[in-house]
Each structure stands twice: as structure tokens, then as C-alpha cells.
Amino acid sequence: MAEQRTRRPHGPMGGPGRGMMPGEKPKDFKNSIEKLVRYLGRYWYAIVAVMIFAAVSTVFSVAGPKVMARATNALVEGLGKKIAGTGSIDFTYIAKVLLFTLGLYICSAVFSFIQGMIMTGITQKTCYRMRKEISEKINRMPMKYFESRTYGEVLSRITNDVDTLGQSLNQSVTQIITSVATLVGTLVMMISISGIMTLISLVILPVSAILISFIIKHSQKYFRQQQEYLGHINGQVEEVYGGHLVVQAYNKQESTIKKFEDTNQILFQSAWKSQFLSGLMQPIMQFVGNLGYVGVAISGGLLAIRGTIGVGEIQAFIQYVRNFTQPIQQIAQVANMLQSMAAASERVFEFLDEEEEELTVEHAVHLDHVDGYVDFSHVSFGYNPDQIIIRDFSAHVTPGQKIAIVGPTGAGKTTMVKLLMRFYDVTGGAIQVDGHDIRDFNRQELRDAFGMVLQDTWLFKGSIMENIRYGRLDATDEEVIEAAKAAHAHHFIQTLPGGYQMELNEDASNVSQGQKQLLTIARAILADNPILILDEATSSVDTRTEVRIQKALDNLMRGRTSFIIAHRLSTIRNADLILVMKDGDIIEQGTHEQLLAQKGFYADLYNSQFEENA
């Protein structure tokens, strides 16, 4: 099994990586929305149903005040007749009108509930499908994609972006329909009551638009600055938290606090101005709206005196004026939601459209058993075409041999492992396993032949038994325990509370680094892969633990072709072949004794480490 790291910094400061910022805009709004619409194509019938139910719900809701006007008129007329002594209030008629109005609002609520339930289902199915496709996509992505991005950036596609898309989709679709329907329906009702009063009330719209655009124009730059410096604040906090010991050791507390205070002051100023300006919007809108109500009340009163309209119509009209501004504000909010939704969908589809590595090949080689022959034939490789780091690398490895790859940092040691497991393909030459070019294998079958133990171990939240069994999921408890014994891990496991059933926490911090490595070695022993890769597996533990790990590794490597990458040359003195790499080339090869006798680069490297240890 290929081991991974326990924890890797997710963002540039070691934080959770970059998610969606509030109000972030897409690079291509139209294309992003078109892709999302096509993606939602399988739910078109449900979306049409949502549109119908939302529109009908709005129609019932908008009709309510106009119907209520009849009850108000009947009440006013009845009071007039009662005062004049010519009649009384017709409560039967008023009750019928009220019951009919109640029925309208109940129908509106029922249709609204149904469309909300359908839309929520569409949204959650879309989010589920997206997360599933992203999860499957991750397993088909080439290694170069993940090495050029932080974990947090990839994870934010599954969490932040999909959540943002889901929330925006759920709200925006229904709000667009209801807002437009409410706007049109309210306008029709207002005109049906009084064209003059409608014109008077509409005068407030351009005034409101001018004031709102003025506020938005001046507050937007402060909102941008607020978001920018909020990011700086988060970055500084993460940076100081992650490097707390270094800050303390170098007595940099004062400079760190000063830097934070400067950034915090800028954030305070921008946040104060942005919140103040945005806070002005509501009272200004209320003031302008109240002016509209005054105009409607005066004109309505004059029309009522002339007998053109009744008091009920004036009351209904005022309610429509109040309702008329709400959909306009909602449409403005929807515009922002659409921007966020488009930006989130753009990032998700950008990931889903990334180039995948080929997992299968035509006429693939299938081997029932891998012996462990490995041949490197004039291999050359570069991460970029103009940056070749391995040049003309050749070596022949027979089954059961221990091959050590040594050299300074950047020599290309780890790159050789990535090529061997086809995380990357060679630029030139070929790598063969049992006489077959590894490019002729399906990637999964090829990687099944390899086991890997890294210095930075990967253990997941779960029991120790489950973590070891990850090497071979169908293994019995007895086989897991035997693997732990072979890895010299059985003794320390028994001393832990719960033994093999002890739960490791999320970071596996409730066991030591050496114990983590022994557990991953046990996992590799259980997997029983014919070829092993040991990458700096003992470079971060004490000498006593290193001896125990080395014994476990000896058991693991017995009878298997093993590639050992280590900076500590004392750990690979018994290797059958040592390949000395420098600047991507093999400059020396041989056994430990042969290389020391040559008194070349390896001898200098070994002696320098010996002197350091001394």
C-alpha cells in the first residue's frame, strides 16, 4: 500500500487552504451558468414543477390584499350606513371574504412548501452527485496536479464550493421566480386599483436606485479591502500559531504583535466604513419608502373624496407598495447569489474537467505473480521539458535484492520512486518489471505489486486493528496480529489501553512517531507486496527505536525486491547494490565496501555523516 503523510499544510500559511470568498466573481459568468444548467438537465421536469408551484404560490399571495379590500370596503360602508341609520355591517359577507382570503394564503403556503421541498431535493441530489464525482475524480487525477496545489485547495472544492453552490442554487432559483412573479403581479394589481397612484409610487424607484448605487459604489472598495485584510489577519494568526515555538525562541513577540496591530487597524478602518455605509441603505430606503407612502396616502385620500376608489383599495394599494420594494431588493440579493453560485460552479467544473491519468491501457499485461525483476533502461525525466533532472539512468535489479538509492537533496531519489509507481511517466527510456514495460500495465495492477513505507506515515482515525488491516482488508485478526509481531509492534500495542482495539485520533498523535512507523511496517507486511519502497523510513526517530524499526524492516524485506531511499547511510550498509545519485545521474554504484574503497563521492558523503554523528 502506498503510504501518505499524516498531515500536510493545507494552505500557504499551513491553514485550511483557500475557499470561496464572500461575493467572489467567476472568470466567465455566462459559461459557468451554462455548464450548471446542462448539469441540472436531468432534473428539468422537477425544475419546471418548482417554477409552476412558485408562480402559483405567488399569484395566490399577491391576490390576497385585493380580495381583502372588499372586506374593508364592506366594513367602511356598513359603518357609514349604521351611523346614518340606513343599515348595518354585513358581517356574513365580511366573514366569507376573510375565509376566502385565508384560503388563498393557505393555498399559497402549500404550494410554497411543495416547491421548497422539490427544490431542496434537487439541490441536495446535485451536491451529492458533485461530491461523488469529485471523490471519484480525485482517484483518477495525476500526481502532478496534487503536487502543484495545496490539499486545502482541493478539499475546498468538495466542501466550501459545493456547499456555496448548493445554498445559492436552493435560494436563487425560487427567489428569482417568486420575485419576478411578485413584481409583475403587484404591478398589475396596483394598476388595476389606480393608474395615477401607481405612477406616484413608481417615482420613488429611480430615487432609490440612485441612492443605492451611490452607497454600493462607495462601500464596495471598503468591502474588498475588508475581505483582503481579513485574509491577512487569518494568515498571520495561522502563521504565528504554527510557528509559535520559533516566535518564542527568537523573542519576536513584539514585532509579531506590531505587525498584527498594523493589519488589524487597517481591517478596523475598512470594516467600520463598509459596515457604516451599508448600514445607511436600510434607513434611506425606509425614508424614501415613507415619502412614497405619503404620496400614496394624499393622492388616495383625494381620489376617495371624489368617490373614485374606496378605503379598502387604498389600504390594499399601500400594502402592494410595501410589497413592491421587497422583490426588487430580493432580485439584487439574487444577483449576488448568482455570482457566488457561478464562481463556485466554475471552480467545481474546472476540477471535474481536469486532465486525468490513464488508468487502463489496451492489451494490458496481466501477471499472476510478480517475481521482482526491475530494469531501468536509459531512463530520463523532467517535471518540465526544459528542466531534466534524471539523465540516462540504467540499472538491473534481481528478485530479493536490496537496492539503496542515496545522494544529496534534489539528486532525484524520490523521483525514481514516483517513476517506478507511474505517478509520472518517463520522458525517455523505459522501466520494466519482470521484463514488461510498466506503461503496458494497468496502473492499479502495477501499484498492487508495490508496498511503501514512508517517514511521514499515514494513519486514519480508527482502531489499530483497522489501520493495520488496511494493508489487506480481507485479513483475519490472527493475520493482523502475526503481521504486528513480525513488525516488532505487538509488544507496544499490548501495552496500550485497549490493545489492538485502541482508537487512534484524527492525527494519530496518541502514539509516538516510532510506533506509527512500526504500524505502517506491519501494514506493509500484511499486504505482502513483492516489491517494496522504503523512503527515509528511519530518519526521524531515536537510535533505540531505529534499531527496532530496522529489525522490522529486515523482516519486511526478506525475500522481496526492496528500494531503500535514505539520507542516513548507516542504515543501508547491508544493501546488495547502492546507487549513488547526483544531479539526476548515477555517478557510482556498488556495495558499501566497494564504494568506500573507491574513495569517491559516496565515501565523502559517508565519512561526513560519520564525522557529524561522532
Enumerate the language-model features and the residues they cover.
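Juxtamembrane loop-to-helix connectors within ABC transporter transmembrane domains
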Residues: 18, 22, 32, 40, ...
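Hydrophobic alpha-helical transmembrane segments of ABC transporter permease domains
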Residues: 41, 99, 111, 115, ...
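ABC-type nucleotide-binding domain
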Residues: 360-361, 367-614
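Transmembrane helices of ABC transporter permease
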Residues: 42, 46-59, 70, 171-225, ...
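Transmembrane helix-loop-helix hairpins at lipid-water interfaces of multipass membrane proteins
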Residues: 29, 47-111, 192-196, 307-311
